[in-house]
Amino acid sequence: MKKMIYTAAVLMCAVVMAACGGQSNVTFVKGNKSQMDSLSYAFGVNIGSGIIYDMPELKLDWTLMNDAMEKQLLEEIVAEDPQQEEARTKLEAFFSGPRIERMNAKAAELMAADSTRQLVREDFVDFDVFQGDEAQRKEISEAYGTYMGVNIRSSRLPLQTYWLKKGIEEYAASEATIDEGLAQAIIQDYYITKLPLQNAAESEAWLAEVEKQKGVKKTESGLLYRIDREGDAAVKPTAEDTVKVDYEGKLKDGFVFDSSYERGESIEFPLNGVIKGWTEGLQLVGKGGQITLWIPSELGYGVTGSGPIGPNAALEFKVELHDVIRAGAEPVTTE
């Protein structure tokens, strides 16, 4: 299996999710030094091996990188982080400028004696792209850690920073207690086996408690809902209609993963083009109304999940139905 965290992609691309600003970070902790966390250590080994394999010339200061990463992992989750943008700017300038120039110069040196030589990564293992510029090494190491930390933080993985850092540091020093293959196996087991089972059990227990709440009803499919505002009962959508809504989506721990309110813009979509829980649930409320939906995973994103929504995760949505556009007709208006 290809690396679970492909570090070049972690560096240059943001995690695809719609996390909303100012939310507490409850998944990353410093951890217990006396009790090893194998998942965190495996992620560290995976990250360290990815950096070294993909960019052997990038001789980072691992301590500075790790400290910058840890600082970000322990901060709250925000939609737009200015520190991330500052780090991105520094990294893009370095990778598109000095790094390319120095790599090209090294390649020219290696090929001077044989222009037909095919260069491979091993040719750059002993090459230091910073060329002794310690100020630049410090700046890029910290920027790399900052940018990577913000992205990993958005994943909300249950990691301990002490063991994550230790995995990176020990792999970089050729002292890791597990190899890349075992690290990937541990990560794969978490995503494919442990996390789906954990989410399924926790979601089932959560929905059972929600069902006991006042005003909550349950459909035959297992969808839980509460009508917060009835709206116009004469103008309810069908599955074939298009609706205009505002909404807020939460995970079972209250984490807001998506919100049209946060973006400041309502959204329109055909009701038969979304998850089953939405298709069924919005037909229960009238135009101008508001409904809260608790959606079991089989009516949501199922065993695959989506972005911040894990496999077998139940969801909560608060939805305001602003308008109903009948299939093949103009928007319905009411006085």
Residue ranges with predicted function:
Residues M1-A9:
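Bacterial N-terminal signal peptides that target proteins for export
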Residues C20-E335:
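Cross-family detector of peptidyl-prolyl cis-trans isomerase
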Residues V15-A19:
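C-terminal motif of bacterial Sec signal peptides marking the signal peptidase cleavage site
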